[in-house]
Amino acid sequence: MNFLGKKVLVVGAGKSGISAIELLSQEGAQTILYDANEEINKEEISKKLPIDYKGDIILGGLSSELKSELDVVVLSPGVPTDLDYVKELKSAEIPIIGEVELAYNFSKGKIAAITGTNGKTSTTTLVGEIMKTYYKSVFVVGNIGVPYTQMVKNTENDSVTVAEMSSFQLETIETFRPDVSAILNITPDHLNRHHTMEAYIEAKVNITKNQTKEDTCILNYEDSYLRTVSGRIPATILWFSSVRELERGLFLRENHIIYRDDEKECVVCDVNELQIIGKHNYENVMAAVGIAIALKVPMDFIREAVTKFRGVEHRIEYVTTKRGVKYYNDSKGTNPDASIQAIKAMQTKTLLIGGGYDKDSDYDDWIKAFDDKVTYLVLLGQTREKIANAAKRLGVKNIVLVDSLSEAVDFCAEHAGVGETVLLSPCCASWGMFKDYEERGMLFKEYVHALKDE
């Protein structure tokens, strides 16, 4: 798509929107930055835009006159596609694309795209580390924090772009075709945005829609949703499993990660060599290895990278030990499945800090996963009473409601015994109390480090 001289409305004044404006301005488009939130500070937005930006910034409503003049609309990932004004733009037959589709117009080299309800950031980061051991030009972008549009003009024909893709980003792709895609797992999440599980699954599977048999899709064999949809995925599928041996793919045998194809079988590594804990992390490693194999990285390079990988911040991140109590930060555990994995990874009695913004999740499976491991459930945020009621119904005894994260940390520090663990794994989004899960995790670590050692 040629944007020279085109009038383009970029919707969303966040990081993705600003980055899209920069790229489109470089391509000679007439850009307009729009956000429905009238309370945003225009001056603050202006500071983030290119110095030579000459386009308008519009907040609140869109005039009919402007709508009639638009050639293209670029939606930021955080903007739901079912908003009234977005529907009006669609009905006017104005082409609407997302930030990923915009970036893809300019992307060179190979692309590995990773999605899934949980494990995206860890897997994307690990794939990036593996690629950097073998390829000279590697870019790690997407939902991981760096907009695809920000880096895409730096890509060359010999580059590898590793992109973390959320369901929000995948809703608006049209021609995006990764050489390798991966869907790590699908469990209920973001139903406040997608409304139905079927719509959420479709958004995830969208990552494969333009692939062909020449491309590869990495899938988790133990995910029933993925087994169900696999028949209509056009790419060549490479499965992984943490439960059973596969005729072809990646799997666990005792403590070893094994790769088997039509010709041979080889040991990738012993899981005891890994610096990350939990079965879910072994699955992330298998997915990353599958992507690397599909992109022709030699096994020696893969093995070196996976055994050095220390994980990502805010995902079952060891913080410190205070007075014989270990503290773990799993602020990225924003849904039941992610938080279940965090609890399973704990080796001792655990004081669990949970609660936050309500994404219409059901918490029963999360609570049932406590078994006898969770000694105190400390709850905060919008969902604290909803979770507390579910926990009481399921027989959880020690439930404590607090008003702040600092209060939660202080309570746990006072009640945790030597050899026990304090885990922040909220099972909820951070919105309302914190800017994002990163701020929540950073504050948790700050409060923990401020605790007295004696």
Swiss-Prot record:
Catalytic activity, EC: 6.3.2.9
UniProtKB keywords: ATP-binding, Cell cycle, Cell division, Cell shape, Cell wall biogenesis/degradation, Cytoplasm, Ligase, Nucleotide-binding, Peptidoglycan synthesis
GO molecular function: ATP binding; UDP-N-acetylmuramoylalanine-D-glutamate ligase activity
Binding residues for ATP: 116-122
Classification via InterPro entries: Mur-like_cat_sf (IPR036565), Mur_ligase_C (IPR004101), Mur_ligase_C_dom_sf (IPR036615), Mur_ligase_cen (IPR013221), MurD (IPR005762)
GO BP annotations, alphabetical order: cell division; cell wall organization; peptidoglycan biosynthetic process; regulation of cell shape
Compartmental location: Cytoplasm
GO cellular component: cytoplasm
Pathway in which the depicted protein is active: Cell wall biogenesis; peptidoglycan biosynthesis
Pfam families the record matches: Mur_ligase_C (PF02875), Mur_ligase_M (PF08245), MurD-like_N (PF21799)
Reaction catalyzed: UDP-N-acetyl-alpha-D-muramoyl-L-alanine + D-glutamate + ATP = UDP-N-acetyl-alpha-D-muramoyl-L-alanyl-D-glutamate + ADP + phosphate + H(+)
Protein role: Cell wall formation. Catalyzes the addition of glutamate to the nucleotide precursor UDP-N-acetylmuramoyl-L-alanine (UMA).
Homology family: Belongs to the MurCDEF family.
Protein name: UDP-N-acetylmuramoylalanine--D-glutamate ligase
Taxonomic path: Bacteria, Bacillati, Bacillota, Clostridia, Lachnospirales
